[in-house]
Amino acid sequence: GEEQKPVRKSDKAYHAAFLRRMVFGNPIVWVLSVSNFFVYIVRFSLLDWGMMLLPHTKGISVAVAGIMVAAFEFIGGNLGMVIAGWATDRLFGSRAHRTCVFCMLGTIVMTIVFWCIPDTVSPWVMAVPFMLIAFFIYGPQALLGIAMSNQATKEASATANGILGVFGYASTLISGVGLGFIADRYGWNSIYAVILVFAVLGLLTLTTIWKAAPDGYGAAKKFTAEYERNSSR
């Protein structure tokens, strides 16, 4: 028989088939994308609406609200991303999706804590759970792109992250227009309930891939072998 030739990565038919298997037909890619949608809603709800939400629900001055929103991202968020990355490598065997599950749990707990704090408490005390929300939600915000690149492999990471980005920025339909409508109709405190709903949805979505491998290179190798066998027939 003819000698089987290894598939060339520049082969257009192979690349198209690879994208179908590792990206468009890969359930993990879609779970990560939907999770990103929920994560971005939580993040932007507090980042974009914080200047309105804090004065209306906690009686905080606009000046102090500005400081808290800045600290939300630059202190809580940046610290959360670093710790989440460390935890992924050291505690979860490079399984970023598992780190994200715990981050979403933390987000839910801290959102409840912040929501329940009475407006008589000092704003500087309130700032602690508020920054901790950022600490937890910025973990997935940073890690989901890494998880996507690992699952789609370097051959398809750009396409997969493009999908992830579309879902992330589609979240503005909720965190932008949707939240404004909800605040007008049901009051500013209802925003916390909305944030909790989407945080829980993000958690539940991520738990469906808890057992997933750290990356998709094993699946990619298997696909390439199958493609070579089929091509040689």
Question: What is the predicted function of each stretch?
Answer:
Residues G1-L32, A225-R233:
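Juxtamembrane intracellular "pre-TM" segments in multi-pass secondary transporters
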Residues N26-V82, Q141, G145, S175-G176:
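Extracytoplasmic gate region of multi-pass secondary transporters
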Residues L54-P55, A87-T88, F92, L179-G187:
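Interfacial helix-cap and linker-helix signal at transmembrane-aqueous boundaries
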Residues G93, M148-S157:
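Paired intracellular helix-loop junctions of major facilitator superfamily
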Residues R95-R98, G180-F198:
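A membrane-interface helix-boundary motif in multi-pass transporters
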Residues L105-D119:
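C-terminal ends and interior cores of transmembrane alpha-helices
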Residues K154-R185:
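A late C-terminal transmembrane helix in Major Facilitator Superfamily
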